[in-house]
Amino acid sequence: MSFFEYKDIIEEGDLVLAFLGRSNIKPITVTKGSQLNTRYGNFEHDRMIGMKYGEQMPGAKGVGFIHLLYPTPELWTVSLPHRTQIVYTPDSSYIIQRLNVTSGTRVIEAGTGSGSFSHSFARTIGVEGRLFTYEFHEPRYIEAKKELEDHGLLANTVITHRDVCNDGFEISNIPEDFKKDDGICGDVVFLDLPSPWTAIPNLKSVISHQSRVGICCFSPCIEQVEKTVKALETEGWSNIEMVEVAGKRWEARKDMVKDVKDVVKRLKDIQSRKNQGIEHRKQSKIHNVGDKRDIKEVETADDSSPEPTKFQNLGKGFNPFGKGLRVREGDEQFQWRNVTKIESEIKSHTSYLTFAYMNPNVRLNTSVE
């Protein structure tokens, strides 16, 4: 299973993302004899083998269905098991674009965490690029390393168990095909740490000396940003800027087109039927005058009278908009127009992104001093 390639047919041992809904995606490894149990039904792994990625799979008893999706970094981000707070696609895509991460880029990442951004970096830099990622928490390091191995990403990724704030970024046993100028020689740096300002002074020995290097620090609090900016200035980084990405989803809908003439005509029709009803009641009272019943009959009728029946509004009279009826969006009997609106629940602040750049001449001058 590899995030670098795509395949059509699902085989045993493959990673499949079971799409139950926009906010409910379950990652499963296809294993013979296993079964995925959901509120939408039961789905046997044996039946998944041989199916195509993207295909809709019905439940075991014909109840419910799921879609079997091929894993991508973006889908993995919204379905992975959380070990830490993660970097979501609105932030990660902006960081990759702004730092100009492309095929062949050498990336240094501190704070592997749940591995969300590691997957995006590894996919973007391709087989020619190199990712050096660090995690200080050993259990998280072990789990992240296994995930990267299972997903075929260790071909361009080295994960290291290290506290980079105290011990730096140097790696003594770098594989030969990962070396450049006998070292890491990073082009881009991403720090997702509680105190990135303590790790910034350790970067100069592992970043490129031949090209401009970009850095992004991911910090939830503005106090962290202040300390990070001071450390960047002290170490000679320039073009420092802090941004915040606010992602909003625009939802497409169809809105029924209502003509003013039809509205006026419907109001007149309602008033006309109302007047007819009033007149009908008046006539009924006139015809019932003189009818006399025994008091006992009246009392008996009152006691045994059933509860009034509630009738559904069936849209009687002139009804050009289907009022009182179940009208499906896009129904061809009515006229529609395409509209958009912002999602009802907008995600709030995630983190501040602090960007800066180091030019080769600044780095060389600092080294000479």
From Swiss-Prot:
Its main location: nucleus. It is found in: Nucleus. GO terms for cellular component: nucleus; tRNA (m1A) methyltransferase complex. Pfam families: GCD14. It comes from the Eukaryota. SUPFAM superfamilies: S-adenosyl-L-methionine-dependent methyltransferases. Gene3D superfamilies: 3.10.330.20, Vaccinia Virus protein VP39. The keyword rRNA-binding does not apply. One of its GO terms (molecular function) is tRNA (adenine(58)-N1)-methyltransferase activity. The keyword S-adenosyl-L-methionine applies. Belongs to the class I-like SAM-binding methyltransferase superfamily. TRM61 family. PANTHER family: TRNA (ADENINE(58)-N(1))-METHYLTRANSFERASE, TRNA (ADENINE(58)-N(1))-METHYLTRANSFERASE CATALYTIC SUBUNIT TRMT61A. This is tRNA (adenine(58)-N(1))-methyltransferase catalytic subunit TRM61. It comes from Debaryomyces hansenii (strain ATCC 36239 / CBS 767 / BCRC 21394 / JCM 1990 / NBRC 0083 / IGC 2968). The lineage of its organism: Eukaryota, Fungi, Dikarya, Ascomycota, Saccharomycotina.
